[in-house]
């Protein structure tokens, strides 16, 4: 009996390893991963208006609109149908991607003493909350033409101490893809995101420029 068991053991081990190998094999196509870059934006201030530049700003983790909380690249079809590009994804989930882009854009503007991400341990003067309303390629016209990419943010800016709201504003951008190819669609996402982020940066800076002198006047009274 022991003799037969010793003969069967290598056979069973081989079958087990073959089974593991079959589970590890996948016929699914590889996922193409895409990312976007933050471009430098012009300063929104003037040489005699240093008030906002003396301030620090924290970018809170963005809130995601329905269907926008994953790393999938979203497209909209006719009849209000939401879908995703197969075999492709952003390098991070959409809120994390937007947070990174917003922080880099604000930092590159030179309008702030420091820009902190949501998880930074350092305190900040102001807090920016972004809600991602749109981040999609829109095919809803149903004409077969290349999609129009829409990027839209709803933003709330407030003082971090006391959470007093200073301003609420929208920032958006759109761009038509050059062709019905994913590379062209991603390029349109880049252009639309650049527009939205530039608007966000300039409006946030303007809001703090307005708020800081007003707060100083109120304390002086």
What are these regions (language model features)?
Residues 81-89, 161-202:
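Short secondary-structure boundary motifs at beta->alpha junctions and helix caps
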Residues 103-111, 201-209:
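Sec-exported extracytoplasmic/periplasmic mature domains
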Residues 62-64, 78-80, 133-135, 154-160, ...:
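Solvent-exposed coil/turn segments that connect beta secondary-structure elements
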Residues 21-39, 43-44, 109-161:
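Surface-exposed short loop/turn segments
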Residues 53-55, 69-71, 78, 86, ...:
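Envelope-exposed proteins and targeting segments
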Residues 21-95, 207-221:
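A structural "domain/chain start" motif
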Residues 1-10:
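Bacterial N-terminal signal peptides that target proteins for export
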Residues 16-19:
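C-terminal motif of bacterial Sec signal peptides marking the signal peptidase cleavage site
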């Amino acid at each position: 009996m022991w003799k037969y068991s010793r003969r069967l053991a290598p056979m069973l081990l081989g079958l087990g390893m073959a089974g593991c190998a079959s589970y590890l094999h996948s016929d699914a196509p590889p996922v193409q991963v895409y990312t976007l870059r933050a471009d430098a934006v012009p300063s929104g201030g003037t040489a005699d208006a240093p008030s906002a530049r003396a301030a620090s700003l924290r970018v809170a983790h963005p809130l995601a609109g329905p269907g926008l909380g994953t790393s999938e690249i979203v497209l909209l079809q006719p009849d209000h149908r939401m879908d995703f590009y197969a075999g492709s994804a952003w390098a991070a989930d959409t809120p994390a991607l937007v947070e990174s882009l917003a922080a880099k854009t604000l930092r590159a503007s030179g309008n702030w003493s420091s820009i902190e991400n949501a998880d930074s341990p350092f305190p900040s003067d102001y807090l920016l909350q972004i809600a991602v309303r749109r981040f999609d390629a829109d095919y809803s016209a149903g004409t077969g033409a290349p999609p129009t990419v829409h990027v839209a943010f709803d933003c709330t800016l407030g003082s971090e101490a006391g959470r007093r709201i200073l301003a609420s504003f929208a920032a958006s951008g759109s761009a038509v893809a050059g062709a019905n190819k994913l590379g062209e669609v991603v390029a349109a996402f880049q252009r639309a995101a650049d527009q939205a982020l530039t608007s966000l940066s300039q409006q946030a800076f303007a809001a703090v420029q307005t708020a800081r002198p007003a707060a100083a006047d109120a304390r002086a009274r």
